UniProtKB/Swiss-Prot annotation:
It comes from Shigella flexneri serotype 5b (strain 8401). It comes from the Bacteria. GO terms for biological process: iron-sulfur cluster assembly. Keywords: Iron, Metal-binding. This is Iron-sulfur cluster assembly protein CyaY. Belongs to the frataxin family. GO terms for cellular component: cytosol. PANTHER family: FRATAXIN, FRATAXIN, MITOCHONDRIAL. InterPro entries: CyaY, Frataxin/CyaY, Frataxin/CyaY_sf, Frataxin_CS. Pfam families: Frataxin_Cyay (PF01491). The gene is cyaY. Involved in iron-sulfur (Fe-S) cluster assembly. May act as a regulator of Fe-S biogenesis.
Length: 106
């Protein structure tokens, strides 16, 4: 994967997250902001999830209250380089915990 393809795929990931949050019908207020390649999800209780791209490594990094994870693209899924879990699984787990209600991105 070259840098432009990486950025295209990361942009697509950001857009999907933003669209899912805009379309959700939950009780809690969840905001999403993109600034300089960093996506910040802010929850009603003030907690945050930070997602950023690491261009030199072609990775997506996820930082939550539970810790940080690094993801490599394998096939059509972003996979954690430590646990083998998918980006969507870990993001949903963290968002659900931080929101205090089920949050789905799929």
């Amino acid at each position: 994967m070259n840098d432009s393809e990486f950025h295209r795929l990361a942009d697509q990931l950001w857009l999907t997250i933003e669209e899912r949050l805009d379309d959700r019908d939950g009780d809690s207020d969840i905001d999403c902001e993109i600034n300089g390649g960093v996506l910040t999800i802010t929850f009603e209780n003030g907690s945050k999830i930070i997602i950023n791209r690491q261009e030199p490594l072609h990775q997506v990094w996820l930082a939550t209250k539970q810790g940080g994870s690094h993801f490599d693209l394998k096939g059509d899924e972003w996979i954690c380089d430590r646990s083998g879990e998918t980006f969507w699984d870990l993001l949903e787990q963290a968002a659900t915990q931080q929101a205090g209600e089920t949050v789905s991105f799929r």
